[in-house]
UniProtKB/Swiss-Prot annotation:
Pfam families: GcpE. Residues 1-12 have a biased composition (Basic and acidic residues). One of its GO terms (molecular function) is 4-hydroxy-3-methylbut-2-en-1-yl diphosphate synthase activity (ferredoxin). Belongs to the IspG family. Transmembrane segments: none annotated. This is 4-hydroxy-3-methylbut-2-en-1-yl diphosphate synthase (flavodoxin). The gene is ispG.
Length: 431
């Protein structure tokens, strides 16, 4: 049979079953073990700047980050952590705070016990936790402090700071092999072994599996996919996904989405971070938004109402539909913090903003509420569809405001405290 003649799948399209992992509680957030995939982020403030760090953690949390990591790189930062935790809690936020430690984490956690107690999770990099004969001792020091404080730990190997002793050992063994592997393959193996050997050592010290999350980050998409596939096949630890040094703007978004999307589709990953390099003066919350959009687009979770909009073509020379799509999308994101508490389930809403008669009415009918704006040469009228039925036609200079009002009406009737049976209660205006 010609490959193009294969029958259509009759099963439900969707990702592979989730890789079964051991659930870890980070504060009050469940990671792994079948829990929803968690979106996390990281601050870029000087942690010693208590007020600045509180402000950014709050912004990230309100944008939807379910865990936030902060750098703890020196004594001033360690001393600031309890004050940051207290400030966040005073704002009514319970977002778990993760401490990111490199080189001197053992020293900071030991000398600043209030810091060790205030954090919800410690991140250890096995490539720089200690060197030569100090490595095992300093690693054990951090693990023992985690056990004492009942904290979770992420053992995070990174391509850029890989354990050089382990890498050298594997490279030497490979060179002596009758069938040597590619150097990149050996480096990937070193990444996986670094994470797994460190996890095994932590268990020997007494840290249970339900307190450990593993990651193995690289900056090349294909290598990242291979590393995490291998890591998942060889363990059942909870897994943190992320493409390190993804880059700025669209490049960073595309690279992270390509790598993480493939792994998530294969059932791999319990928590994700989109590591974007922000534009100068850019909004740090962008990485949270991208992470949410990735999970929502793939059907894993819902965070905000989806706005479908056509890309535009020669039939849509007017920018009206583009401006309306942007306006509606921004409007929804701005209102979501309030809507989330007032209208449970509103994140499942689908909105369509289309630009001409070709696909506009059809796409709008598939949405809960949609509008089809007139294309070039078409009658200057914008039909609105509600739950698949034509509801009203908008005209004039206030189409954007009128459509927003209809969206609000729909939300109030569908998701309000005493919801009416769907949007059918919305009364169409006379045409």
């Amino acid at each position: 049979m010609n490959k193009l003649e294969n029958p259509l799948r009759d099963d439900v399209a969707g990702p592979a079953p989730r890789h079964q992992t051991t659930q870890v509680m980070v504060g009050d957030v469940a990671v792994g073990g079948g829990a929803p995939i968690v979106v996390q982020s990281m601050t870029n403030t000087d942690t010693a700047d208590v007020e600045g760090t509180i402000k950014q953690i709050a912004a990230l949390a309100r944008a939807g980050s379910e865990m936030v990591r902060i750098t703890v790189d020196r004594e001033e930062a360690a001393a600031a952590v309890p004050h940051i935790r207290d400030g966040i809690r005073k704002l009514g936020l319970t977002t778990p705070i993760i401490g990111d430690f490199h080189y001197i984490g053992h020293k900071l956690l030991a000398e600043y016990p209030a810091c060790a107690e205030a954090l919800d999770k410690y991140r250890i990099n096995p490539g720089n936790v200690g060197f030569k004969n100090k490595r095992d001792t300093q690693f054990a020091d951090i693990v023992e402090i985690a056990i004492k404080n009942n904290k979770a730990v992420r053992i995070g190997a990174n391509w850029g700071s890989l354990d050089q002793e382990l890498l050298t050992k594997l490279m030497d063994e490979n060179a002596a092999s009758a069938n040597p592997r590619d150097v990149r393959a050996v480096t990937r193996e070193a990444m996986v072994q670094s994470a797994l050997l460190s996890a095994a050592r932590a268990e020997e010290i007494g840290l249970p599996k339900n307190k450990m999350i593993l990651s193995a980050k690289v900056s090349a998409v294909q290598d990242l996919i291979a590393v995490y596939q291998d890591l998942a096949s060889r363990s059942d630890y909870a897994i943190h996904l992320g493409l390190t040094e993804a880059g700025m703007g669209s490049k960073g978004i595309v690279a992270s989405s390509a790598a993480l999307g493939i792994l998530l589709q294969q059932g791999i990953g319990d928590t994700i971070r989109i590591s974007l390099t922000p534009e100068p003066g850019g909004d740090r919350t962008r990485e949270v938004q991208v992470g949410q959009e990735l999970l929502q687009t793939m059907g894993f979770r819902t965070f905000v109402p989806l706005v479908a909009a056509c890309p535009g073509c020669g039939r849509t020379t007017s920018t009206t539909f583009q401006e309306l799509a942007r306006s509606i999308q921004d409007f929804i994101r701005d209102e979501m913090p309030e809507w989330r508490s007032r209208y449970p389930g509103v994140e499942n809403l689908n909105v369509a903003v289309m630009g001409c008669i070709v696909n506009g009415p059809g796409e709008s009918k598939h949405a809960n509420i949609g509008i089809s704006l007139p294309g070039t040469g078409e009658t200057p009228a914008a039909p609105v569809f509600v739950d698949g039925e034509k509801f009203r036609t908008l005209r004039g200079e206030n189409i954007a405001a009128d459509f927003k009002a209809l969206v609000i009406d729909y939300i109030e009737q569908r998701y309000g405290a005493t919801p009416k049976p769907g949007a059918a209660q919305m009364v169409p205006a006379a045409e």
